[in-house]
């Protein structure tokens, strides 16, 4: 079985943002030359996520609001994790909800998505 591994790095200027990385992943797939199989995309940072959904701004705002309602950033003291001196207890919980990775079928050298599906790093 052939495999290919490449790391992609993203700088996210805000505490929470959703970046469409579909083109980046597609570029890696093309570089790999793999025509059939599976493509695993995972976040290698403990408070980052990778997920598949629609690239629609209103939906992304809904996600941000919903996640903040589930695990508000403040008050920072509400999270036992933050006793370590960090302030990201909420981000760990949000990542758990959004997920660490996605797997996409590769068919004919292309990412095999359903309608509207895109890959996001958040």
Feature-to-residue mapping (PLM):
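Active-site histidine-anchored catalytic micro-motif
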Residues: 1-122
């Amino acid at each position: 079985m052939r495999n290919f591994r490449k790391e992609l790095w993203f700088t996210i200027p805000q505490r929470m943002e959703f970046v469409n990385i579909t083109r980046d992943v597609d570029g890696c797939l093309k570089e790999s030359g793999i025509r059939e199989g599976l493509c695993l995309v995972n976040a290698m940072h403990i408070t980052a996520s990778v997920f598949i959904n629609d690239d629609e701004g209103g939906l992304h705002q809904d996600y941000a609001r919903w996640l903040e309602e589930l695990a508000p950033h403040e008050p920072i003291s509400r999270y036992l994790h933050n006793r370590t001196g960090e302030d990201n207890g909420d981000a760990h919980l949000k990542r758990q909800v959004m997920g660490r990775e996605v797997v996409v079928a590769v068919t004919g050298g292309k990412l095999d998505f359903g309608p509207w599906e895109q890959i996001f790093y958040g």
